[in-house]
Regions:
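Secondary-structure end/capping motifs
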Residues: 230-312
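Residues that mark the N-terminal boundary/hinge immediately upstream of a DNA-recognition element
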Residues: 7-8, 132
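N-terminal export signals
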Residues: 10-31
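Conserved C-terminal helix/tail region of periplasmic/extracytoplasmic solute-binding proteins
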Residues: 299-332
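Soluble non-cytosolic domains of exported or imported proteins
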Residues: 46, 77, 145, 149, ...
Length: 332
């Protein structure tokens, strides 16, 4: 799917919906009655969620009859509880987290997939690069011990002996790599590599998704009850998400600028946000989404996820993914 370029001025303005209403002589009170719902984000506000900010700023949810609150996540704000409780209509999660919750009885379904490619990478420096999984043998990798199953899955998928890799427990920072304490880092494509680039440090990344690590990320989850009883709200919410993320793709710099305009107290740096926003695009959009639309998946991509999740100790079936809301959004 393609989108027409959007000017920064339009992003930072009052929104197309409000402008259209004004042109028609309508007052805000004459617009469609609004249903208040919440979208629980998986982390703190940043350009990671800028497509949602665009949908809100442009009034696309308002057009659809929703008053959407964007709830920030964070280390002390897990996604799953508010979705289970019904205080959030939808949450932003990931297939592995959802699989874990379902194994404990949570009635979740995945409605859409924002990140088609998992953002986990192995970051390294050009003088001692990791270009493919086999290059990890004999190297020291800095990572959280909790992510050992992730590394083990990558090794299993690529025939690499994990015992040949030295795992060094580190905080989530580029400093151990820059100080020579490790040879590489397990991190996200959109954060520590960007931080190094902003410091003027050349670095490179090996995207684990390119080597079989298939775990859908930034997924939209809702409960089975919500799917059964609040479908119109789900369709309206996801319709806004689709429009917002297509607009984001058209101008990631404008999306980053909007992020800072909406959340000026979040301590965000504009240039960093611009780089992060741009690096996110290849993770979210592909030939698959160009053919079918933002958030889509296929039986093949689900099968690949099930295989990787099994290596992570999570047994799931294809019915964890429910495409019926997206099918309504796209009229499929």
């Amino acid at each position: 799917m393609t989108s027409m370029p959007l000017s920064r001025r339009r992003f930072l303005g009052t929104g197309a919906a409000a402008a259209g209403a004004t042109a028609l002589g309508l007052k805000p009170s004459q617009l469609r009655a609004q249903t208040a719902v919440s979208l629980q984000l998986s982390w703190l506000h940043s350009s990671q969620f800028a497509g949602s900010y665009i949908a809100q700023d442009r009034g696309w949810w308002t057009e659809a009859g929703l008053d959407v609150s964007l709830l920030p996540g964070g280390p002390n704000a897990p996604v799953e509880p508010p979705v289970v409780a019904g205080t959030a209509l939808v949450g932003i999660s990931a297939a592995d987290y959802t699989a874990a919750a379902v194994s404990e009885g949570a009635p979740f379904k995945i409605l859409g997939v924002a990140m088609q490619k998992n953002p986990f990478v192995v970051a390294s420096l050009p003088a001692n690069p990791v270009n493919e999984p086999a290059d990890l043998v004999g190297k020291r990798i800095g990572m959280a011990l909790a992510n050992t199953p992730v590394l083990q899955a990558l090794c299993s998928l690529n025939g690499v002996d994990i015992n040949g890799i030295e795992i060094v427990p580190t905080q989530y920072s580029a400093q151990p790599l820059l100080a020579g304490e490790v040879d590489c880092l397990l991190c996200w494509e959109t954060d520590l590599p960007v931080a190094m680039t902003m410091q003027g440090v050349d670095n490179q990344t090996m995207l684990m998704a390119d080597y079989g690590y298939s775990v859908h990320s930034q997924t939209y989850i809702a409960t089975e009850d919500t799917l059964a009883n609040r479908r119109s709200e789900l369709v309206a919410l996801m319709s806004g998400e689709v429009r917002g993320w297509d607009a984001y793709r058209a101008d990631t710099d404008a999306a980053a600028e909007l992020t800072l305009a909406m959340y000026p107290d979040a301590g965000l740096d504009l240039e960093t946000q611009k780089r992060q926003a741009a690096r996110q695009v290849p993770l979210m959009f592909s030939d698959l989404t160009d053919a079918n639309g933002f958030g889509w998946w296929t039986d093949d991509t689900v099968a690949a996820n099930i295989e990787t999740l099994a290596l992570l100790g999570r047994t799931v079936t294809p019915d964890l993914w429910d495409r019926s809301i997206l099918e309504e959004v796209y009229g499929a």
